[in-house]
Structures are given as C-alpha cells and as structure tokens.
C-alpha cells in the first residue's frame, strides 16, 4: 500500500526534515550547547598566552629582591601561571628589575632578541624607567630601558612592592587579551594599557647636576668647622666677611 502524501506519518516527517534544508534557522540542542564552546582563534590564543606567562629571571639591582619575594609562599605568583625561566628561549616575559648600564645594554638587547614571539617587557623601578638616582651625574646608567627595547608596562617605585608587580601582571594580561594574531608581525608599541589618567604638575628638577659647583662642596660650612674644631681656610674667612659686608 503506497503512503498517502496528504497524510504523512511521523516517520516520513522526520525523514523529510533530515533530507530537506529547512528555511528557518537551525536550533542548537541542549546537549550540543553543553559540550561545545564557540569562540574565536584570537580569544583562544590570547587565553592560552595570558594564563601562562613565563618570566625571565633578570635582575641587576635591589628591585630584584622584591621580585624574588614573589616566589615565596606569602605571595605565590604561581597562581598567575608564572613560571620563572633561566633561558630567554623559554621565556615570553622579561622584567627588567634594576639599573641598566651602558655595558649591560647590549646583553639586555640580545636577551630580548632571543626570546620567541610574542614577548613582553615590564620595566620595574625608577632606575629602569628613568635612571633613578643615577640619572643626574652617572656616565654609565641608561636613562630608561625603553630606549633599548619596547616596554609594555611601567612599575614606578624605589623599589616597588610585590603587590605592584601583581598589578602590573594583571594589566599586562588585559593587554594580551585585546591582541590579535594579525598583529604578531608588528613590532611597534601598540595597545598600551593605562589604568589612571594622572594630572601631574610640572616642577623644577631637584637634581640639576650643578651641585658640584656649590660652595659647600669645596669647603664645609663655617658652623660645622667651628663645631668640629676644623681649621678655617683664610680664603673662606675672607669671602664670608665680604658677604657679610655686602649684606650689611
């Protein structure tokens, strides 16, 4: 007996639904939605990167002591997926902790170039960012590591606390989450993450590099000499008398 096309059975309806392409939008079943995750390649790639940042152990001054404190149980930076490495070929993050000298600059650039892409840099401490207390009269300190390699996050302080390093890691993870695979060939500094717009007031520099020309450098003050029983040079006594006459 041939099937009646006017009254199709349930089996025929199911078979027809499987063969024909329905005009309506296909519905995702509950089983499929619970077992399949829909995402993009960029999101998956960035998630894998930001969850396993491997920093290179690089320290040249006292700031590295604060970074070494993160390895202990009090701060435990392993919960961020940070695994310290001693080889630049196994690291994708370098934290420049300490002063960078002219002699160390070529070695730092070589370490950065040996790191595989994608790679990131965190400048930790005032000496790394601007030269710090060595920026006024030092002939060997580099005034900013960003003159050598591109920097993603800056951590000011002398030295910064371990909590500040965690804050920098979180900001770097947010920066990594917004990247795209198409930008891997771009070496310029893009997509920097700024947390706060600071309203800084420009003031005159305290260290102008002219303190060697001050009179107290050539001879101590007269009060100090008298208190310590130091002999007062005649030239200094004459100059002080002239200053008193000019004032009077």
Swiss-Prot record:
It comes from the Bacteria. It is found in: Cellular thylakoid membrane. GO terms for molecular function: 4 iron, 4 sulfur cluster binding; iron ion binding; NADH dehydrogenase (ubiquinone) activity; quinone binding. Its EC number is 7.1.1.-. Residues 1-2 form a propeptide. Its cofactor is [4Fe-4S] cluster. Its main location: membrane. It comes from Synechocystis sp. (strain ATCC 27184 / PCC 6803 / Kazusa). GO terms for cellular component: plasma membrane-derived thylakoid membrane; respiratory chain complex I. NDH-1 can be composed of about 15 different subunits; different subcomplexes with different compositions have been identified which probably have different functions. PANTHER family: NADH DEHYDROGENASE (PTHR11995), NADH DEHYDROGENASE [UBIQUINONE] IRON-SULFUR PROTEIN 7, MITOCHONDRIAL (PTHR11995:SF14). It is a peripheral membrane protein. NDH-1 shuttles electrons from an unknown electron donor, via FMN and iron-sulfur (Fe-S) centers, to quinones in the respiratory and/or the photosynthetic chain. The immediate electron acceptor for the enzyme in this species is believed to be plastoquinone. Couples the redox reaction to proton translocation, and thus conserves the redox energy in a proton gradient. Cyanobacterial NDH-1 also plays a role in inorganic carbon-concentration. Keywords: 4Fe-4S, Iron, Iron-sulfur, Membrane, Metal-binding, NAD, NADP, Plastoquinone, Quinone, Thylakoid, Translocase, Transport. One of its GO terms (biological process) is photosynthesis, light reaction. This is NAD(P)H-quinone oxidoreductase subunit K 1. InterPro entries: NADH_UbQ_OxRdtase-like_20kDa, NADH_UQ_OxRdtase_20Kd_su. It catalyses: a plastoquinone + NADH + (n+1) H(+)(in) = a plastoquinol + NAD(+) + n H(+)(out); a plastoquinone + NADPH + (n+1) H(+)(in) = a plastoquinol + NADP(+) + n H(+)(out). Binds 1 [4Fe-4S] cluster. [4Fe-4S] cluster binds at residues 62-63, 127, 158.
